[in-house]
Amino acid sequence: MPLINVAGSLLYSALYFSAESEYMQKAHSASDLSYFFASGSNQTERAGSYIGSRQIRCLSSIGSSALTKFVVSLKQPNPPVEPSSKALSHASPPSVSS
């Protein structure tokens, strides 16, 4: 279970920094300078809402594709397993000689 938590935090961090760098690239382009240099606390609020919406979109697309793959894997029938002679020899109880 801790491995899942670590993987989740790494994924969250990666998505956060990718969304943040994309925001900074957008903000430094000539057309978006007014968006970046908004007055007062609006700047951080806008940055946070932009980054938050990007994270939600990334996570929802990742979640939906993972859910789709999981459902498709459930619908596919499992191939029949052929018992091998080796497995059958191990399955029989050993004979006791006295």
From Swiss-Prot:
Domain of life: Viruses
Chain positions covered by the region annotation Disordered: 77-98
Protein name: Putative protein p20
Annotated organism of origin: Acyrthosiphon pisum secondary endosymbiont phage 1
